[in-house]
A protein has these predicted regions:
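Active-site helix of classical SDR
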Residues: 121, 157, 165
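Residue(s) in the substrate-gating loop at a strand-loop-helix junction
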Residues: 141
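Conserved glycine-rich Rossmann-like NAD(P)H-binding loop of the short-chain dehydrogenase/reductase
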Residues: 32-46
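Conserved amphipathic alpha-helix within the SDR
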Residues: 49, 60-63, 67-81
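C-terminal helical subdomain
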Residues: 72, 181, 199-290
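Conserved glycine-rich cofactor-binding loop
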Residues: 9, 16-17
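Substrate-binding pocket helix/loop in short-chain dehydrogenase/reductase
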Residues: 97-98, 102-107
Length: 292
């Protein structure tokens, strides 16, 4: 089987350099018509478009920032007649410890990562329905999964993408619209200054791109998934719930009861793996129903 993207149009935000360029190249190599966006603050996007087109790729560069999500999607449809998938990779950081972070720094980072993802999805939705479905891939970060010092805004936005994708999974299932999240790590010009050449070779961005392209393909059945990817390794991440502390609610439940049973709250020797909200909630209240 060879998964191809002929006659499909894919938008890649932040697609002119680093991981984004690798996504653009991978999709173009698979036959997609790729529209990639950049801030337009340099000539990089235009140069990448020229180089890739000379090599035979069907690519279009749009110097439109991700925050202008509605205009970006409408430009893609205007130029290409359709849109089949979106890879939301564009963004930036404005790092500061929480105590020193300004409202502007918080809002700017939330805007380019999370709010843009929402607006891209909402604007593309009717166009996806017109062509029989669509795929959304939101590029997250290990900072979103695990937190990172000085990146409260970035971490919150990047984990927020997962909640957005899970909701799109539920709302889009009936119309063949799916969404997934990938937290990649690759060597780029922004993070590789202190890397040795061996590490750079292992962490090439093109070793991450295939999972992003697969999740953007119409034949990929996955939706609502969260994945980590680096150096040709691809792993799915899921929630784990401890067996927990189950107190007798026929008696008053107090702070001291929770404190005394804290080891049970945090005991993962016999965990469950809820995959949806109802399943998680049942794990909390059903033990009481079964004991009645």
């Amino acid at each position: 089987m060879s998964l191809r993207f002929e006659e499909k149009v894919v938008l890649v935000t932040g697609g002119s350099r680093g991981l984004g360029r690798a996504f653009t190249q991978c999709l173009a190599d698979a036959g997609a018509r790729v529209v990639f966006s950049s801030t337009g603050q340099s000539t990089t996007g235009a140069q990448v478009e020229k180089e890739m087109r000379q090599a035979g790729a069907d690519v279009v560069h749009l110097p439109i920032v991700a925050e202008e999500a509605e205009r970006l999607v409408e430009q893609v449809v205007s130029k290409c007649g359709r849109i089949d998938a979106i890879i939301h990779n564009g963004g930036f950081v404005q790092d500061k410890t929480l105590r020193k972070m300004s409202d502007q720094q918080w809002q700017a980072v939330m805007g380019v990562h999370l709010e843009a993802a929402f607006k891209l999805s909402r604007t593309a939705w009717p166009h996806f329905e017109t062509v029989g479905g669509g795929r959304l891939v939101f590029i997250s970060s290990s900072a979103g999964l695990y937190g990172n010092f000085g990146q409260a805004n970035y971490a919150a936005a990047k984990l927020g993408l997962y909640g957005l994708a899970r909701t799109i999974e539920l709302e889009g299932a009936a119309v063949n619209i799916g969404a997934n999240v990938v937290a990649p790590f690759g060597a780029t010009e922004l993070n590789s200054a202190n890397m040795d050449e061996d590490r750079k070779a292992v962490l090439r961005p093109e070793y991450v791109a295939p999972i992003v392209a697969y999740l953007a393909h119409r034949e990929c059945p996955e939706s609502g998934g969260l994945f980590e990817a680096s150096a040709g390794s691809f792993k799915k991440v899921r929630w784990q719930q401890s067996a927990g502390l189950i107190l007798d609610t026929s008696q008053p439940v107090g702070i001291d009861d929770v404190a005394a049973g804290w080891a049970s709250v945090c005991d993962f020797t016999a965990p469950s793996y809820p995959s949806e909200m109802r399943e998680s909630l049942r794990g909390l209240y059903e033990p009481h129903l079964l004991s009645d």
